[in-house]
Amino acid sequence: MAFSFGFSGDDIDDVDAHEAPQPTTTPAPSAFPVPGKPQLPAAAHSLADLLARLPSKVAYSSLSVQLDDGTAVQLPRRELWDVRVQLMAEEDGDAEAAEGLGKHDVKTGVYEGGFKSWESSVDLVKVLAADPSVTGPRTSPLSVMELGCGTALPSLALFQWAMAIDAPDRGPTSFVVADYNPTVLQLVTLPNFVLAWALHHRHSPLLQEAFTLDGELELTPDVLQAFQAYLASSKISLSFISGAWSPEFVQLLYAAQPARTASSLALVLGAETIYSPFALQAFTEVVFDVLNRERAAPESSAAALVAAKRLYFGVGGSLDDFVDKAQSKGAVTSTLREETEGVRRGVVRCVLGTSDGAAPAN
């Protein structure tokens, strides 16, 4: 099923009335980002390995995002109740992952929100939709790095727009999606990409047979092989990284991407990633590591698009704090979107200034 929303709460809550009761779990002793506690090291995950661990079918719904031009983009998402069923069915049920399937939002040290779709990620989709350099035809490479991706709505939108461009008019496109929790990548991020591809090609005989009347997609070996074949033939790469933000994390970001030989655009995306001072510091360091690497690369341009609440009550992060940190590091920032109804939110663009202090052109 599909639905639109005009939300004013903290997150996009699509809890189905038919969901099973939430399991009782013991909170995990630690999770990113908590100062002084062990963090998961950064790790890359191959597409083939993650595909091999998918269930035989996934249930999904579509989120209808109303854009500023009056149109809408439909973004598929695996149902949370379907994720819960999979976790409960697995012998080594992941208590930490199940903790993320309740109705709460961020609980520092326990759950960081990866299974949910957040308001700011939708704000970021709206900003990207208004930028023809990423939605329309292009011959130069595009590199997308989404940090703290969760359900990866911004990357999913870019993926769908890339699929809609004729192959001769689409330059190489790479997506590196990263979440601290590898279970999030396995259970929601990758399934959402497969769903987006399948729905875009749903009229093919293979996929007509794979979609069920109950709102499910059967992930047969033929379907998964066709997904991989499409990526390879379309010059689209999809890579996954888990673990804490760190210099090693940035090294994996670049190791995961194909070599870029022509002028290219790199986008760093982050939605709801700066909700505490500790998270803000780690996120900002990674963003500037990437921006500095891109500035050193020939014929490359880069920008970070950061979407967040103006203030995270009780945990200490804020969008204004990110802007202050970015400007103190010599970046040029601009506000691309403001939301004042309900929880105040914004989207800012961050680029490194030129030697004369001006922002580089797109």
Language-model features and meaning:
Residues 1-362:
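S-adenosylmethionine-dependent methyltransferases
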